[in-house]
């Protein structure tokens, strides 16, 4: 077990945004957390990563946690080579562990794992959105984490780039054996990457199961999410 969440609760003022959520993710598994906008998906990742504090429940993790942010969060003033080992320089325990030549080899290894060998000297502005995302993957795995959190990893990407990113999420799971959580609203990402799916609605769990089971659900929330139908419990503002 790498992640276990028990009865998780988070509120902002009087607004409870995460309401009694529980799940487990083992090593080598990918859990997709899905739902409509505002359902609390990204808040769960922020709670697990420690970016915000919970108001109730337990979060039990084993090993280092890495976060891949929605918009890559690369440092524009640094080239790829300097972006990737950022955690190795900032964490005192890791700074003392690796010599300069070792860091260089680690960067090359991680870039190769995401299919980007040879771009060390390029700056983020010189890369496509998909390439920036893959660099952020390389940065995430530089500390050999046991847990990888992906926040909307295909946001803003074209369909082919999205497929490539989805394939690398699965590949990194296989190569690192990390427990992974992918927050997404894309059915393609769910079907290509996830072993299990947790669906939230209004901060509450309304489904937990496999991607195939999600597609067969007839409950109003899950059915509308899968079909992208405008008719259902989730109402869109019409122009």
Kindly give the residue locations of the regions a language model identified.
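Catalytic Walker B motif of ABC-type/P-loop ATPase nucleotide-binding domains
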Residues: 148-151
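Conserved catalytic motifs of ABC-family nucleotide-binding domains
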Residues: 144
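Helix-to-loop junction immediately C-terminal to a conserved catalytic motif
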Residues: 49
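Conserved ABC ATPase signature
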Residues: 123-127, 131
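A short, surface-exposed alpha-helical micro-motif characterized by mixed small hydrophobic
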Residues: 190-192
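The feature captures the beta-strand-to-loop junction immediately N-terminal to the Walker
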Residues: 34-36
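Conserved ABC ATPase "signature" region
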Residues: 98-118
């Amino acid at each position: 077990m790498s992640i276990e969440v028990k009865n998780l609760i988070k509120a902002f003022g009087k607004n409870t945004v995460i309401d009694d959520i529980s799940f487990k993710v083992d090593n080598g598994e990918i859990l997709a957390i899905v739902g409509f906008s505002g359902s609390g998906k990204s808040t769960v990742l922020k709670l697990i990563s420690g970016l915000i504090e919970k108001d109730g429940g337990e979060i039990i993790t084993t090993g280092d946690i890495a976060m891949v942010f929605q918009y890559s969060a690369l440092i524009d003033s640094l080239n790829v080579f300097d972006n990737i080992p950022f955690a190795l320089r900032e964490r005192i325990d890791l700074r003392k562990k690796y010599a300069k030549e070792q860091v260089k080899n680690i960067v090359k290894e991680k870039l190769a794992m995401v299919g980007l060998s040879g771009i060390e000297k390029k700056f983020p502005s010189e890369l496509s959105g998909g390439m920036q995302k893959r660099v952020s993957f390389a940065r995430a795995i530089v500390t050999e984490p046991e847990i990888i959190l992906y926040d909307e990893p295909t946001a803003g990407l074209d369909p082919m780039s999205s497929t490539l990113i989805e394939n690398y999420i699965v590949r990194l799971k296989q190569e690192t054996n990390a427990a992974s959580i992918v927050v997404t609203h894309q059915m393609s990402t769910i079907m290509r990457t996830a072993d299990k799916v947790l669906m939230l609605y209004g901060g509450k769990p309304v489904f937990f199961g496999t991607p195939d089971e999600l597609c067969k659900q007839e409950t109003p929330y899950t059915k509308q999410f899968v079909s992208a139908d405008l008719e259902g419990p989730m109402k869109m503002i019409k122009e």
